[in-house]
């Protein structure tokens, strides 16, 4: 019985560690006005997906009344940072 309990505990712990270390990551994007994009829970998932597209990420949704973008790196959180980092126009960004 003790072996069974230890085995179950080990499986649960390894599963919890695996789930926490393999998260997709993401960020709340920041607008031109240096504020987060607000939304209504689950009603604005399409809006948030469009916002995330502006930040170079293909998927996002409304979470805790703000848009959340999956796999949005810290480098591209701000609207203009994404364009500076990815735009090839030397006249705008020397």
Swiss-Prot record:
Q: Which Gene3D superfamilies does the record cross-reference, listed alphabetically?
A: Knottin, scorpion toxin-like
Q: What keywords are annotated for this sequence in UniProt?
A: Disulfide bond, Neurotoxin, Secreted, Signal, Toxin
Check the record and name the CDD domains matching this protein: neurotoxins_LC_scorpion (cd23106)
Q: What terms describe the molecular function in GO for this protein?
A: sodium channel inhibitor activity; toxin activity
- Cysteine pairs forming cystine bridges in this chain are 39-62, 48-67, 52-69
Signal peptide from the UniProt entry = 1-22
Look up keyword Signal and say if it applies: yes
> What is the reported tissue distribution?
Expressed by the venom gland.
Which cellular compartments is it found in? Secreted
| Pfam families from the UniProt entry | Toxin_3
Alphabetized PROSITE patterns for the sequence: LCN_CSAB
Q: Where is the LCN-type CS-alpha/beta domain?
A: 24-88
GO cellular component labels: extracellular region
Q: Which InterPro entries match?
A: LCN-type_CS_alpha_beta_dom, Scorpion_toxin-like_sf, Scorpion_toxinL/defensin
What family classification does the UniProt entry report for this protein? Belongs to the long (3 C-C) scorpion toxin superfamily.
Free-text comment on this protein's domains from its UniProt entry: Has the structural arrangement of an alpha-helix connected to antiparallel beta-sheets by disulfide bonds (CS-alpha/beta).
Specify the protein name: Neurotoxin 213
């Amino acid at each position: 019985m003790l072996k069974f309990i230890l085995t179950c505990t080990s499986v649960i712990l390894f599963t919890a560690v695996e789930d926490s270390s393999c998260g997709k990551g993401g960020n709340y994007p920041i607008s031109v006005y240096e504020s987060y994009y607000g939304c209504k829970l689950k009603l604005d998932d399409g809006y948030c997906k469009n916002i995330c597209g502006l930040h170079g990420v293909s998927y996002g949704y409304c979470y805790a009344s703000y848009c959340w973008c999956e796999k949005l790196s810290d480098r591209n959180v701000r609207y203009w940072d994404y364009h500076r980092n990815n735009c090839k126009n030397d006249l705008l960004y020397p």
